[in-house]
A protein has these predicted regions:
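Conserved anion-binding
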Residues: 65, 77-166
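Glycine-rich phosphate-binding active-site loops on the catalytic face of alpha/beta enzymes
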Residues: 32-42, 89-104, 137-148, 188-212
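Catalytic cores of alpha/beta
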Residues: 20-25, 77-88, 122-133, 169, ...
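Conserved N-terminal beta1-alpha1 strand-loop-helix module at the mouth
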Residues: 1-67, 131-134
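Short, well-ordered coil/turn segments that N-cap beta-strands
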Residues: 6-10, 29-31, 64-68, 90-92, ...
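Active-site mouth loops of central-metabolism enzymes
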Residues: 2-21, 68-78, 112-122, 172-181, ...
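C-terminal helical cap(s) of enzyme catalytic domains, especially alpha/beta-barrels
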Residues: 47-48, 152, 201-220
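Surface-exposed amphipathic alpha-helices with a cationic face
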Residues: 1-4, 26, 58-65, 87, ...
Length: 220
């Protein structure tokens, strides 16, 4: 997984697979992007189709030349055949909730970094077991959906520190909390390798997208 070595990375989860959103994020200073297939995204309200339906838009986003990861689905919608096809497109990593990942997920990723998202109740022991099974990065899902948009808490920082200190792979924190730029230093100090800005903080409007991302990139 391609991340800056000396600082926290700012990644952006696109609320739609649109090149205009990707371009705005890159201009605002994003180090990488995340796109989706086969899932309904809670925070943005977007339903993403299968790889064939999203392929043209994904190619346009990948053509920007910044590292991009692909969410390959949710419970019951992850297609190993689609993952095999997507490996050839140039994605930096694949991502799925660990609880939704097929047993052959790591092998299906091939040369693409296999990332999995921990559930809100998963801690260091679960993280260690996933790394032992070949996962190359972890997304620390921090909140149940009914708490999305709440401020960063001490409990989340403590959980992040516990997980990050237990594994030797990057730990990425998504903005399920309503993170503010000043939170990035706290996340870095607790062991995060990257923050993943999503719809909770970026919104979904193309016109405002870059302006909402820029303060986080400037805070590094």
């Amino acid at each position: 997984m391609r991340l800056p070595e000396s600082r926290l990375a700012v990644l952006v989860s696109l609320p739609r697979n649109e090149a205009a959103l990707a371009q705005a994020a890159v201009r605002a200073g994003a180090d990488g992007l995340k796109v989706h297939t086969n899932v309904r995204h809670r925070a943005s309200g977007t339903t993403f189709g299968p790889l064939d339906a999203e392929r043209e838009a994904l190619r346009d986003i990948l053509a920007l030349g910044v590292p991009a990861g692909l969410v390959v689905g949710a419970a019951g919608s992850v297609s190993i055949a689609e993952m095999t096809a997507a490996r050839e497109m140039g994605f930096d990593y694949f991502d799925v909730y660990a609880a939704d990942a097929p047993s052959t997920y790591v092998e299906a990723c091939g040369p693409v970094t296999p990332m999995v998202a921990l559930g809100p109740g998963d801690g260091p022991s679960q993280a260690q077991a996933l790394v032992r099974r070949g996962c190359g990065a972890l997304e620390l899902s921090t909140l149940e959906p009914d708490r999305y948009g709440t401020p960063l808490t001490l409990a989340t920082l403590a959980r992040l520190e516990a997980v990050a200190s237990a594994v030797d792979v990057p730990v990425i924190v998504p903005s399920q909390h309503a993170l503010v730029p000043d939170d990035l230093a706290l996340l870095r100090a607790a062991g995060a390798a990257a923050v993943l800005l999503g719809a909770v903080v970026t919104g979904t409007d193309v016109a405002a997208f870059g302006a909402r991302i820029a303060p986080y990139a400037a805070a590094l």
